[in-house]
Amino acid sequence: MNELELLGPRAYGEALGRAVLKATAEDFQVDEVLDIPLSGDGEHLWLWVEKRGLNTEEAARRLARAAGVQLRTVSYAGLKDRQALTRQWFSIQLPGKADPDLSAAQDDTLQILKSGRHKRKLQRGAHAANGFTLRLTQLDADKDALNQRLETIARQGIPNYFGAQRFGYQGGNLGEARDYAARKALPEQRAVRSRLLSTARSYLFNRVLAARVADGSWQKAQVGDLLAFTDSRSFFPAGVDECSDPRLAILDLHPTGPQWGEGPSPAGGATAALENTVADDESVLRDWLVRAGMEHERRILRLPIGRLTWHYPESDILQLEFVLPPGCFATVLVRELIDLVPVGQTDSSCVF
């Protein structure tokens, strides 16, 4: 499957050109934002770690080996990309133990920048946001058009699609999920099960969002919508009055789409009709999610781009800096601007 099939239409028109992303790890930098002051004592050792060309799970395994503990005692808030320079927190549970020597875990791909003790372990999803610095190199695009589109995005946000990375190479994760769903089976390995269930939910969400981008309703509240604030998982129904809430205009409040689970869509009106139609069209995936015990959740359809700035360090480089909530994809912003080409290739666009 290609990117258009996995995500959906762009909100602001065709790509304005093309560029390369991730020619080096430094071209894609991620800093986890965690608003948790450490207590200074406790059985959990928290580590601020810089990784280069190393994903989160590999880093956790390396820390566990160096500390001489089981992998399950190492915790992290979120998964970060391998092809990037990332800084994120880990915690290691060490009841009654001194701080271990972690030098064996460190090399050119992993450095511990600071550490401290805390009374609790680091919970999944505990980070407040992710800060990004992206460098798009070999840029071939009109800068005036790019600047205008970036200004529009800063004012209006972008569709909050799950990025193509969620679905694996050419949508391979979705193919695996469909195979298990058709057999009414679940993977035995917990990590595989989680990955494929997330893939299926993400695809159904993207189908709904794609339809609302196509009809122009993705950033507008309509009666029957369920509305949520940017940083909240709770939601409330939209009536006539809620559809004119001024917080919609300033990108604090947004319509939401389904993270599918048990039961029909809790939305109403045209929103429920669309969501249930998508679920009925993909009934095998929907029923698989329900049998797996997934609960219905919501995700905002519109993604505000926090603290968005940009400049051109060189004539063929665009540098973007911005902040996104957890679980949102930086590459979805890039997609609204340009097509990406693989490193060393300039004659055709890359599905990314």
Swiss-Prot record:
Alphabetic keyword roster: Isomerase, tRNA processing
Q: Which reaction does it catalyse?
A: uridine(13) in tRNA = pseudouridine(13) in tRNA
Q: Is Oxidoreductase among the key words of this record?
A: no
What the entry lists under SUPFAM superfamilies is as follows: Pseudouridine synthase
Chain ranges of the TRUD domain: 157-303
Which molecular-function annotations from GO does this UniProt entry contain?
Answer: RNA binding; tRNA pseudouridine(13) synthase activity
Q: Which PROSITE patterns match?
A: TRUD, UPF0024
Q: What is this protein called?
A: tRNA pseudouridine synthase D
